[in-house]
Amino acid sequence: MSLKKSPFFELRSGSVDTLLFTVKTTDLDALRTELVKRFEATPEFFADDVVAIDVRRLADGERVALADIRQMLNDVRMRPVGVVALATQGWAGEAGLPLLEARDRRAPAAKPADEAEPAAVLAVEAAAAPAAAAAPEQSSDPVPTLLQAGGQTLVIDRPLRSGQQIYAKGDLVVLAPVSHGAEIIAEGNIHIYAPLRGRALAGVHGNHDARIFCTCLEPELISIAGIYRTTENPLPADVLGKSVQIRLEEEKLMIEPLRLT
């Protein structure tokens, strides 16, 4: 086989960001009920988002019907793309979904099945076939925009419109408004010196020490290391539209006013 480069396609190692749907119960009826309850108030929020099914929290010997969970996620308009499992969970590869390797830093801990936990946002890599990735192109059109800085701080000084996305491998500094429908993602901290009206996700590879700093908090979603909060739960008056810092404390998001004077 010739090793000459093809002008028509390219295969190379890559990674994508996806929601991580962590399964902590084998009771699929209860899981379905909770999914409907969670999404009925904001049915469009995660529409068409890709998601990986994470079964690492299940106890030894427990199994779930991944095909049924896949259908549940399809029913709420999410797109399951694979399964994240432990090496001992060989059954996870029988559902017809590719096995993925999550690059989160913290190993999953056993928790009670009735303890509420939101989906996590993590970067996952396919264990079998590498993903083809195209170089991002700059455009003034309101389409998704992906920018990466290899471990360095990325500074954005232009407004972000609906549908645009920024990704930073280190810290991210934004000096202009983040509109509804726009998304900013960083593996480190996020600093926003303007109104945040879209989504902000910090510490996306499981960095629980990451923080979000914002001078005007009016978000659709905020997240650190996969722990998130949406506007489905209104923010308190002392932080809504104010300067704040957001951090994690014992797996809970803490939103605190910033004292700038």
Curated annotation (Swiss-Prot):
Signal sequence extent: none
Superkingdom assignment: Bacteria
UniProt xrefs under InterPro entries: CAP/MinC_C, MinC, MinC_C_sf, MinC_N, Septum_form_inhib_MinC_C
Keyword list, A-Z: Cell cycle, Cell division, Septation
GO terms of biological process kind: cell morphogenesis; division septum assembly; regulation of cell division; regulation of cell septum assembly
Family the entry assigns: Belongs to the MinC family.
Subunit composition and interactions: Interacts with MinD and FtsZ.
Function, in words: Cell division inhibitor that blocks the formation of polar Z ring septums. Rapidly oscillates between the poles of the cell to destabilize FtsZ filaments that have formed before they mature into polar Z rings. Prevents FtsZ polymerization.
Name of the protein: Probable septum site-determining protein MinC
